[in-house]
Curated annotation (Swiss-Prot):
<comment type="function">
    <text>Promotes cell expansion-dependent organ growth, probably via a brassinosteroids signaling pathway. Acts downstream of BRI1.</text>
</comment>
<comment type="similarity">
    <text>Belongs to the plant organ size related (OSR) protein family.</text>
</comment>
<keyword id="KW-1133">Transmembrane helix</keyword>
<dbReference type="GO" id="GO:0005783">
    <property type="term" value="C:endoplasmic reticulum"/>
</dbReference>
<dbReference type="GO" id="GO:0009741">
    <property type="term" value="P:response to brassinosteroid"/>
</dbReference>
<keyword id="KW-0812">Transmembrane</keyword>
<protein>
    <recommendedName>
        <fullName>ARGOS-like protein</fullName>
    </recommendedName>
</protein>
<dbReference type="GO" id="GO:0005634">
    <property type="term" value="C:nucleus"/>
</dbReference>
<feature type="region of interest" description="Organ Size Related (OSR) domain">
    <location>
        <begin position="71"/>
        <end position="122"/>
    </location>
</feature>
<dbReference type="GO" id="GO:0016020">
    <property type="term" value="C:membrane"/>
</dbReference>
<keyword id="KW-0256">Endoplasmic reticulum</keyword>
<dbReference type="GO" id="GO:0035265">
    <property type="term" value="P:organ growth"/>
</dbReference>
<feature type="transmembrane region" description="Helical">
    <location>
        <begin position="76"/>
        <end position="96"/>
    </location>
</feature>
<keyword id="KW-0963">Cytoplasm</keyword>
<dbReference type="GO" id="GO:0046622">
    <property type="term" value="P:positive regulation of organ growth"/>
</dbReference>
<keyword id="KW-0472">Membrane</keyword>
<dbReference type="GO" id="GO:0009825">
    <property type="term" value="P:multidimensional cell growth"/>
</dbReference>
Length: 135
């Protein structure tokens, strides 16, 4: 058991060193990777066995709050109800006649408007910074 903790501790320290080196390289903007060594950074603080166990047990905790999950309970009820109604209503309702042609143009017009707005340049060009480039 002690050997497992020491091996795990070494792995965690190696990951921390790798992460800190990657962050330092990103901040500096240094793209010369020839001189990079994973042991060259400042040593990570060594954690005790109890501290290591606490961090591991808190990460793999099986107890999770409903509010911390991706969907809340209320949204799950709404999604299940909407799904059930979309599956059941077409079986119950009689076939409906198609809507008038002008009514079909409304969603097409909304889509065209959204595409025009999406490709329109921003009117506030003073606040555009050069750090917002993604490439």
């Amino acid at each position: 058991m002690i050997r497992e903790f020491s091996s795990l501790q070494n792995d965690i320290i190696n990951i921390q060193e790798h992460y800190s080196l990657n962050n330092n390289m990103d901040v500096r903007g240094d793209h010369n990777r020839k001189n990079t060594s994973f042991r060259g950074s400042a040593p990570a603080p060594i954690m005790g066995k109890q501290e290591l166990f606490r961090t591991l047990s808190s990460q793999n905790s099986p107890r999770r709050l409903i509010s911390a999950s991706y969907f809340s309970l209320e949204s799950m009820v709404v999604l299940v109800g909407l799904t059930a109604s979309l599956l059941i209503l077409p079986l119950i309702l009689p076939p409906l006649p198609p809507p008038p042609f002008m009514l079909l143009l409304i969603p097409i017009g909304i889509m065209v408007l959204l595409m025009v707005l999406a490709f329109m340049p921003s009117s506030n060009s003073k606040h555009v910074s050069s750090s917002s480039t993604f490439m």
